Amino acid sequence: VSHILSSCTIVINGVDRAGQGQPGVSSQTEIPGKTISIATFKPQNNGTADVVINMSNFHNRYGGTDQSIILGSAEMLNQSFVFDLLFYNLTCTVLLLFSIFFIVLHLNYKKMPYILWFAFTTITISIRISVFYPHILAYIWPTIPWKLYFILRYSSMPLAALFFTIFIKKIFNMQYQYVYFGIVIMCILSTAFIVITPTLIISQYLYIQQAL
């Protein structure tokens, strides 16, 4: 079961096999999760299996899985997940190395300030990749607070747009200042809204952000 940024348990043939967080009947009893769920099981004697997925999303009203629930042999799924984990780990590492390179370059060439903004852009994109499937950050930092994980997941998009817009402005000297300031203000307000506002309210407006 893909990451749902909420909580769920997977019950197979009457036995709890895996889960994300802890489903509850209210926001007080729910503990939201921040990773994926992988459950191994064997079918019953008649070749069938009863699979029940319990979900609750009191912290994130739009929480839910938007990807397929994958069934297959344990070996095949494990190989697929390990490949994805290595691929996205490599992607994040390359982006971070790029950002470090550009930061060092900026320290040695003060006349090119736009390099620093490109470094910030690559760092933000790397963070964004790490908080989506296969959720590298959740494995590196298992105790990361769910609220912080939520903020990193959704603020990374306006922040990346903000840094990249400033980078473009610095390197090309944009003539249409009102367009530049409009994008910058919108990105700053969007980021501030995500950081300050309770997640229950934020989740109701995320589709607007995604549409923009």
Tell where the protein language model's regions lie, with residue ranges:
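Aromatic-lined ligand-binding clefts that engage carbohydrates, nucleic acids, or primary amines
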Residues: 1-13, 51-53
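Residue-level recognition of short loop/turn positions
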Residues: 13-15, 155
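Solvent-exposed beta-strand/loop surfaces of large extracellular or lumenal domains
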Residues: 15-36
